[in-house]
Amino acid sequence: MKILASDFDETIFFLDNEEKNKKNIEAIKKFISKGNIFCIITGRNYSDLKYYLTKYDIPYSYLICEDGAKIFNNVDYCLETVLLNPNDIKKIIPVLEENKSDFYLDDGYNKTNNYNDCVKVVINSKDEIEKKRIVDLLKNKGSYHIYASRTHVNIINNTVNKEKALKKLFNIENLDYNLLHVIGDNENDYEMLKNFHGVVMKKHHQRLDELKKEEVSSLEEYIYQIMEWILEKEISLFFIYFYRW
């Protein structure tokens, strides 16, 4: 058995490539059907992600949403939630309002106005200069982590990232780290790619270059690579047992 944790956008799912989506989903189904565990780990919230999983019939064993602030099992029971500190939100909001930023608070499922039930502040922006300016305005002002993605600036609790979320999941579910493989393409995948065995997508954020990871053209390619390793190990064990017998 193997455990694969995969980023969602531009790794599993592509808005502009239905053929690649289809091949990835078929590979995921084969991977799970062989008794392996497949975890989707994303910056999206649960409701947003679940829409695409249902629409495209994408199976999973676990979901890690909001960059690790929410963890769910295969029946969508929430195993873990990490909230933003309300006092930090009170510092963040005036800065964003003064900057006239387009933003919202996210409770892990939907937009919220409740500072006591917020896992992420999301600022909408596709402008690289504007995103950098927002990060510079807000960094080092509280106990939170702020980073820019393709279309947003994201603010989460500073105890949250994808690597830490995987460690929590493995502790909760008593899973074996030696079975884990990871794949991603963006800056929020950095920590898990640095600390676990895995690969990056060929088209990836430049920060991931410093990790010097193997590159693959698709999730499908990596899944079949892992399944081939499993088969080779099973054959090897069979012959060891056969000759001992």
Model-found features: residue ranges?
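Mg2+-dependent phosphoryl-transfer enzymes with acidic/Ser/Thr/Gly-rich catalytic loops
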Residues: M1-I3, I156, E163-W245
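Asp-based phosphoryl-transfer active-site loop
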Residues: K2-N17
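Conserved Rossmann-like nucleotide-cofactor binding loop
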Residues: T11, Y46, N188
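Short, flexible loop segments at the rims of nucleotide/cofactor-binding pockets, characterized by
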Residues: F14-E18, I40-I41, T81, N158-T159, ...
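Short amphipathic alpha-helical segments
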Residues: N17-E18, Y51-T54, I134-V135, K194-N195, ...
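Active-site phosphate-binding/coordination module
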Residues: E19-Y109
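Short, structured coil segments at secondary-structure junctions
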Residues: Y56-P59, D67, K141-G142, K194-F196, ...
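Conserved acidic, metal-coordinating active-site core of Asp-based
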Residues: V95-N195, K203
